[in-house]
Regions:
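Long C-terminal interaction/binding lobes of large macromolecular proteins
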Residues: 101, 129-198
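Cys/His-rich Zn2+-binding cysteine-cluster or related metal-binding knuckle/ribbon modules and their
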Residues: 2-8, 17, 27-92
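Extended interfacial segments that mediate partner engagement and assembly in macromolecular machines
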Residues: 26, 75-143
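Catalytic cores of large soluble enzymes that bind and process phosphate-bearing ligands
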Residues: 3, 36, 40, 116-120, ...
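Conserved, well-folded catalytic cores of nucleic-acid-processing
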Residues: 14, 18, 36, 51-54, ...
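S-adenosyl-L-methionine-dependent methyltransferase catalytic core, i.e., the SAM/SAH-binding region
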Residues: 8-16, 27, 63-64, 76, ...
């Protein structure tokens, strides 16, 4: 590669780090950035910088927030007897779009995956267990219906059941091997309504 395209190659490499983005997609995004005005490109860079410096994990549910506690955890209108456990903050947005769930959430920030060297100790499991008190009556396992999602849900259910708290799993409507993030509102609604006890 000629020396003068090194910054472009670096940009392509950085975009290529995103999950699901291959070389072609990364190249397309890099050229889109190059086609932006300087003001637009700087606004994008600043938005990334602000998100990384101003957002952190909610001390209760582990979702991203600018404050100490996120809006959902702080809301007195939420049902505090139900906690929905999700893999990532993106999954909260997917479930919230259904307008059918009014409980609280807990973000694990990953799934148990021995093949990838990810164990329960690398997830926000101890934070979840610390939240389980006499107020909580049900924990919904809303992890993706993949091998890792199922393993994580079963692991958590084994930890929670002895506490006398009902543990349920999202049911039909979610195809096996898919990601919760890509499910539409109707599919998620049916899965929430048809959840089963673990």
């Amino acid at each position: 590669m000629p020396q003068n395209v090194e910054p472009l190659e670096n940009l392509i490499d950085q975009f290529g780090r995103f999950p699901g983005v291959g070389r072609k997609g990364a190249t397309r995004m890099a050229y889109e950035v190059m086609a932006m005005s300087n003001e637009q490109a700087m606004a994008l860079a600043k938005a990334i910088e602000h998100a990384k410096t101003d957002l952190h994990r909610c001390r209760v549910c582990q979702d991203y927030t600018a404050g100490e506690v996120c809006g959902i955890c702080a809301s007195p209108k939420r049902d505090r007897s139900i906690i929905c456990v999700v893999e990532s903050p993106r999954d909260i947005q997917s479930i919230e779009r259904t307008h059918e769930y009014n409980g609280l959430y807990h973000v694990l920030h990953g799934l148990i995956s021995p093949m990838d060297g990810v164990g329960a100790e690398q997830l926000c499991v101890k934070e979840l267990l610390a939240r389980l008190n006499e107020t909580v009556k049900e924990v919904i396992m809303a992890t993706s219906p993949t091998v890792e999602g199922e393993a994580t849900a079963m692991y958590l259910a084994k930890l929670i059941k002895p506490l006398g708290i009902k543990t349920t799993r999202l049911a039909y409507g979610l195809p096996v091997g898919s990601s919760l993030e890509y499910a539409d509102e109707t599919t998620l609604y049916r899965a929430m309504q048809g959840r089963g006890e673990l």
